[in-house]
Amino acid sequence: DSFIAMIYERLILMRDLLAVDGSIYVHCDWRVSGRIRLVCDEIFGVNRFISEIAREKTNPKNYTKLGFGNNHDTIFFYSANQKCIWNKPFETRDKDEIEKDFPILDVVTGRRYKTAPLHAPGIRNGETGTSWRKLMPPSGNHWRYIHATLDQLDKEGRIEWSSTGNPRERIYADESEGVYIQDIWLSVKDPKDSYPTAKSEVVLERIIKASSNEGDLVADFFCGSGTTAAVAEKLGRKWIATDLGKFAIHTTRKRLIGVQRG
């Protein structure tokens, strides 16, 4: 239809503007997601597809429809080339998650931790496959670290020994980067904004941080209320924001006046 024809032409232009290590995120809903995926596969290449993100919607309205309620929209993530900028995204754990994931409390330091095996699957012929302190790794496994590193971990009190002499590594909560973000995004709903397609700053911050570095250029060719440009500015990125609608441009300009670079 006319929308697919329009987006097809624009996606080709966007592809040609991508940096060699750049990427693109295409946000759509259930009405066009299947066709948009096919269009993106054709334009960017099936082998450049990275992720399909399902994002919880702000106000699902499916109470009278036949079928399961639709409470998500879709973000397709493609890269320009085989390698693109990727900064692994992590989400901070809340107190309950920390206590669940790191169930042991060090009564001396007050730090929470969990323990993990010091061995990993697979046989190695080097030092990690040999005896350490008269201990061999379990059959079919090898030590995760060379002997010198194991000695250093033990010296620092980072190895916990069981009553049977089994060593395990202490992993502390305050040294954890957080929870690695997956492709189902909950609790990142759009703001209740006067602009109908306003996007959550949390969503844009997550995308921009993951796929760009400070000083990089971020572009949004359907800028709407200007969330992408506002977040890019706060994160120290350069940006381009365009839209066909005069109201969108007015809204974006007004919004960006008060944005402070981070």
Briefly describe each language-model feature range.
Residues 1-261:
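Core catalytic lobe of class I
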